[in-house]
Design a protein with these regions (language model features):
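Membrane-embedded alpha-helical bundles of multi-pass transporters/translocases
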Residues: 1-364
Length: 364
């Protein structure tokens, strides 16, 4: 059992790393394409490299940490080294001109972006996969709801912080000294939030069953419904990530909004609509089913996406930002479903599998 301080230490730790991940998702494309003028194709490849790295690293880190044996336990070493590494990669990614100069060639800038993008995503998997695997080893079932609630609060607060800073980032970057300070504070903030869990939570005493890689893979692949969902979620996730990462660039280059507060207004609306429609889609899912509701959210998102080029291709009889706000609202309504349903559907699949087989494989 964890005491209150230990529960708080574990639950609040992800606030910093989730903030960095959220901000990275919003701004990683904009910074290199819209600010450092890296070719958009190269910018896309640099970001794709990071996604590939986190997919591979996230898959294996759980198994690697399971077989780790140190005086600090299985999980703490990854937290001790992972938190500073994540902060360093985040900081370095956004300030290439301090190391490469302002007149750097495209290829060198691409290599720099791809390396630190990949390092950031590797560090995130290196840190978070063992950290989450730590929970069943240090908590009892009856206290996990409270700890998970703290983590959900941390993630929600992190999303709010990352949206606000993300939409202010173009203005922040134009003031070089301010950018170094803001990015530095965020990086230090992330490291400090993991320190309480390292200091106050003892190493795990319970031993969770050791995984059998081949057996577990056979179980996963044999579950056809789960595999279908993974494929669908993967395709939707790729398109959603690509779209959301271009929001800052779209607002600045297409809509023509460059002021910090004006850009921030788009971010605030985006956040309010996404969170507000959690309730709407949740109510609809109870009445109409999750499948129909998720299909509707994807259709709304697709319609918003199809009409976004209108602002750049047609002369409008009213200010472009009016239509921009409409597209942001529609897109946020669709994105809300993407953020709400995946974990719910995974839980439903795990529950169905437990009923069918009599074995609990939620961890897989």
């Amino acid at each position: 059992m964890l005491n209150k301080l230990q529960k708080f230490s574990y639950g609040i730790a992800r606030l910093g790393s989730s903030t960095l991940l959220g901000l990275f998702g919003w701004a990683s494309v904009y910074v290199y394409w819209g600010y450092y003028n890296l070719d958009p194709v190269l910018t896309g490849w640099a970001n794709a490299a990071g996604k590939i790295v986190i997919a591979v690293a996230g898959f294996f880190m759980g198994y690697i940490s399971d077989i780790t044996k140190t005086r600090w336990g299985k999980r703490k070493p990854y937290i001790i080294f992972g938190a500073p590494l994540l902060a360093l990669a985040f900081y370095m990614y956004f300030i290439p001109h301090h190391f490469l100069g302002r007149n750097v060639d495209q290829f060198t800038l691409f290599i720099y972006a791809a390396f630190f993008n990949s390092l950031f995503h590797f560090s995130y998997a290196f840190l978070l996969t063992p950290f989450q695997a730590w929970m069943p080893e240090i908590t009892e079932p009856e206290e996990r709801i409270g700890v998970s609630a703290l983590q959900n609060f941390s993630n929600l607060l992190a999303n709010a912080i990352s949206v606000v800073i993300g939409f202010l980032l173009p203005s922040i970057l134009r003031q070089d000294g301010l950018a170094l300070i803001v990015l530095g504070i965020l990086a230090i903030f992330e490291v400090l939030l993991y320190f309480p869990s390292i200091l106050f939570i003892p190493k795990e005493t319970k031993t969770v069953l050791q995984p059998n890689f081949i057996k577990d893979m056979k179980i996963i692949i044999s579950n056809k419904e789960y595999m279908k969902w993974v494929m669908v979620q993967g395709l939707v996730s790729v398109s959603m990530t690509m779209t959301l990462s271009l929001v800052l660039t779209y607002i600045e280059k297409v809509i023509g909004i460059t002021g910090g507060l004006a850009s921030l207004s788009f971010g605030i609306i985006l956040l309010i609509v996404i969170v507000g429609f959690f309730y709407v889609w949740g109510r609809m899912a109870k009445k109409k089913g999750k499948g129909k509701t998720l299909f509707l959210t994807n259709m709304i998102f697709m319609i918003a996406l199809l009409f976004t080029p209108i602002i750049g291709l047609m002369k409008l009889p009213f200010p472009s930002y009016v239509l921009g706000y409409l597209f942001i609202v529609l897109g946020a309504m669709g994105a809300s479903g993407f953020h709400l349903f995946p974990y719910v559907i995974i839980a439903d699949l795990a529950h169905k599998d437990e009923i069918d087989t009599g074995e609990n494989r939620a961890g897989l």
